[in-house]
């Protein structure tokens, strides 16, 4: 059984799954949740990832990072990044044209790249899988939106590397959902529309599935529409209501906003199954309690335009794939936001009453498919995966600039990848000594409106009239969507090439290695912290336990002995209260001192047969402190 997993790295939540014995397991995290918030929190003492980070976001907004997926592989001055910055409670800074997140961590200011933040979330998913499978997990298939361009895909791959994962492949989320769905669909050709409305992004894809072969026909979407936008509508609605009722504006207070947002997210989820729900937040702002309620109808009205706008990309993919909506055989809903009844109704009505499929949990479908793909790539011999072949597509057209700034496409969008295309070009002027090959991605006719991926020079062309030299340009896109462009002058055989992993966005090998080392360091610190806490808990538990045992010992011990142990135990408890941040060694030393006083006296009690069963916790009698893993309480304090 392979230990390869599928990871859905989402904007707001992530999910990990594993395929074995012909079935997929969605793996729950240490909190028992099948999805984990894509949040990382930094405090004075530790780094938190997932639920723990999200739960403290209200108290620590400036140092709790989320939505890293909106930043990954982008430039700082990208309009999307600039727009998002206004809404982030944490600070973004410009480092060599790339966004980095600045936080206070353990008393110092630290900068992290979006890749590092995503790698922490991926690391958390890796640990979740490891504790469930009871073995190391190295290989993973990680998913990205169909819309992600080259540098975003590459940056996601880098994040996996930093987390210590070997990323077998980056696959499109809708493709993954289709695999989850298509495993058992063998036979005639079917057109499947994947409608994926997640926490932060919206993607629609049209696939054809035939004999286990998947082909993506078209993709469209909105990188900025999802559950968070519906939460925002609720948040704004309640800010206005609070203003009306209390004549106060709470939108200036980050903590109040965060608490309100958490309540709104909860209310939204409740409204998917109930017609109305109440929102109750004690002391929300300036000591004022906020108690109110909201109905499903009001929520639908607040988000009406957003819900309606989800149909535009649906129309676009049908146009691109040249299909009528009646030719769509199956509709698959993916992403937690498709649980909203109004969204389901809009989709059903658009397809003239055709019911969408919901057999797979919408927020788990992508990880499910990624796990199947991981099993295939690591050679799982299951009959279920035997005949499955995956064809992905290039999300945007790829081409080069020709005379007059024209975009000449070599690979049109929605081409199946991996793919390779060649075309012959020539010089534009007589005796031109070289050509500049500029590679663009995008759909516009002029290159200035498209996205420059990279460029290189092919020089040393022998003097000749214009149009005579033959320069063959080859575009080769591999299965991860990474592009190699080469050019050869046929007369001389001179050639040059470029691998486009979007250099501007690409982390260098050194950067990645540095970040991998840093990730290891953080992991060690996290482990150190949990060992420190274990020692502290153990000391506390033993001190209290001794106190209790002594108070119940009655006349089996002399008063002086009882006093000695009680006094030492109380001293220890007092010391604990005033030294919560002590090191593991200090806790262990205190335990030694406590045992030096208590052990001889406790031995007397045992000989007198006085200690109740299990009263004396680990290490009695016996001098050395036991290993904290083995002893001490195994439950954690909850907030």
Swiss-Prot record:
Residues bearing Phosphoserine are 20, 551, 603
Q: Where is this cross-link: Glycyl lysine isopeptide (Lys-Gly) (interchain with G-Cter in ubiquitin)?
A: 556
Q: Where in the cell is it found?
A: Cytoplasm; Secreted, Cell wall
Gene Ontology cellular-component terms for this entry are: cytoplasm; cytosol; extracellular vesicle; fungal-type cell wall; fungal-type vacuole membrane; mitochondrion; nucleus; plasma membrane
Which residue positions does N-acetylserine occur at?
2
Q: Does the keyword Kinase apply?
A: no
Which InterPro entries does the entry link to?
Answer: ATPase_NBD, Heat_shock_70_CS, HSP70_C_sf, HSP70_peptide-bd_sf, Hsp_70_fam
Q: Which UniProt keywords apply?
A: Acetylation, ATP-binding, Cell wall, Cytoplasm, Isopeptide bond, Nucleotide-binding, Phosphoprotein, Secreted, Stress response, Ubl conjugation
The record ties this protein, via CDD domains, to:
ASKHA_NBD_HSP70_HSPA1 (cd10233)
One biological process term in Gene Ontology: response to oxygen levels
A GO molecular-function descriptor: heat shock protein binding
Residues of the region (Disordered) are: 605-639
Name the major location: cytoplasm
> What Pfam families does the record tag this protein with?
HSP70
Q: What else is known?
A: Present with 364000 molecules/cell in log phase SD medium.
Summarize subunit and interaction data from the UniProt record for this chain.
Answer: Binds human HTN3/histatin-5, a peptide from saliva, and mediates its fungicidal activity. Interacts with NAP1.
- Its biological function? May play a role in the transport of polypeptides both across the mitochondrial membranes and into the endoplasmic reticulum. A functional difference between SSA1 and SSA2 proteins is expected. SSA2 can participate in the ATP-dependent disassembly of clathrin-coated vesicles.
Family label: Belongs to the heat shock protein 70 family.
> What is the name of the protein in this document?
Heat shock protein SSA2
């Amino acid at each position: 059984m392979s230990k390869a997993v599928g990871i859905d790295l989402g904007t707001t939540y992530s999910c990990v799954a594993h395929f074995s014995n012909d079935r997929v397991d969605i793996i729950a995290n240490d909190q028992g949740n099948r999805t984990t918030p894509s949040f990382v929190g930094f405090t004075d003492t530790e780094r938190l990832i997932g639920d723990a980070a999200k739960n403290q976001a209200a108290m620590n907004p400036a140092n709790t990072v989320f939505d890293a997926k909106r930043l990954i592989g982008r430039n700082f001055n990208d309009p999307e990044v600039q727009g998002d910055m206004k809404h982030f409670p944490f600070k973004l800074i410009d480092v060599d044209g790339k966004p980095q997140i600045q936080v206070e961590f353990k008393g110092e200011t630290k900068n992290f790249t979006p890749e590092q933040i995503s790698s922490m979330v991926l690391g958390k998913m890796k640990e979740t899988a490891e504790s469930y499978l009871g073995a190391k997990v190295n290989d993973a298939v990680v998913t990205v939106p169909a819309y992600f361009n080259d540098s975003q895909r590459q940056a996601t791959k880098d994040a996996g590397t930093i987390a210590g994962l070997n990323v077998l492949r980056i696959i499109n989320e809708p493709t993954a959902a289709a695999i989850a769905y298509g495993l058992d669909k063998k036979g005639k050709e079917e057109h499947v529309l994947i409608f994926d409305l997640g926490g932060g992004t919206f993607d629609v894809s049209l696939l054809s599935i035939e004999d286990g072969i998947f082909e993506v026909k078209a993709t469209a979407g909105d990188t900025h529409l999802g559950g968070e936008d519906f939460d925002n509508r609720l948040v704004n609605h309640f800010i206005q209501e609070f203003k009306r009722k209390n004549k106060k504006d709470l939108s200036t207070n980050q903590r109040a906003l965060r608490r309100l947002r958490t309540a709104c997210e909860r209310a939204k989820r409740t409204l998917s199954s109930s017609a109305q729900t109440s929102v109750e937040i004690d002391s929300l702002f300036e000591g004022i309690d906020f108690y109110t309620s909201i109905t499903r109808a009001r929520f639908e009205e607040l988000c009406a335009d957003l819900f309606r706008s989800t149909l535009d990309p649906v129309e676009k993919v049908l146009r691109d794939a040249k299909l009528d909506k009646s030719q769509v055989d199956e509709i698959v809903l993916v992403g937690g936001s498709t649980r909203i009844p109004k969204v389901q109704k809009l989709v059903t009505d658009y397809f003239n009453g055709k019911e969408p499929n919901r057999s797979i949990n919408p927020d788990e479908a992508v990880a499910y498919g990624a796990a199947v793909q991981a099993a295939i790539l690591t050679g799982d011999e299951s009959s279920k995966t035997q005949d499955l072949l995956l064809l992905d597509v290039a999300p945007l057209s790829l081409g080069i600039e020709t005379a007059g700034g024209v975009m000449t496409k070599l690979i049109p969008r929605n081409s199946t990848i991996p793919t390779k295309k060649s075309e012959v070009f020539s010089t534009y002027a007589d005796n031109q000594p070289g050509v500049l090959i500029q590679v663009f991605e995008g759909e516009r006719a002029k290159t200035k409106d498209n996205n420059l991926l990279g460029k290189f020079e092919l020089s040393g062309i022998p003097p000749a009239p214009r149009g005579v030299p033959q320069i063959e340009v080859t575009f080769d896109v591999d299965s991860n969507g990474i592009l190699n462009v080469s050019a050869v002058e046929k007369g001389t055989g001179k050639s040059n090439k470029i691998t486009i992993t979007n250099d501007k966005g690409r982390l260098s090998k050194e950067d990645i290695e540095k970040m991998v080392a840093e990730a290891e360091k953080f992991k060690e610190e996290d482990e150190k912290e949990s060992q420190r806490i274990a020692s502290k808990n153990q000391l506390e538990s033993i001190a209290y336990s001794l106190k209790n045992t002594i108070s119940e010992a009655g006349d089996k011990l002399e008063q002086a002995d009882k006093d000695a142990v009680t006094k030492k135990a109380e001293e220890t408890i007092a010391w604990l209260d005033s030294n919560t941040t002590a090191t593991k060694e200090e806790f262990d030393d205190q335990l030694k001192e406590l045992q030096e006083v208590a052990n001889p006296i406790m031995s007397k009690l045992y000989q007198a047969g006085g200690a109740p069963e299990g009263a004396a916790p680990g290490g009695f009698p016996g001098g050395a402190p036991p290993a904290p893993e083995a002893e001490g309480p195994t439950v954690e304090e909850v907030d």
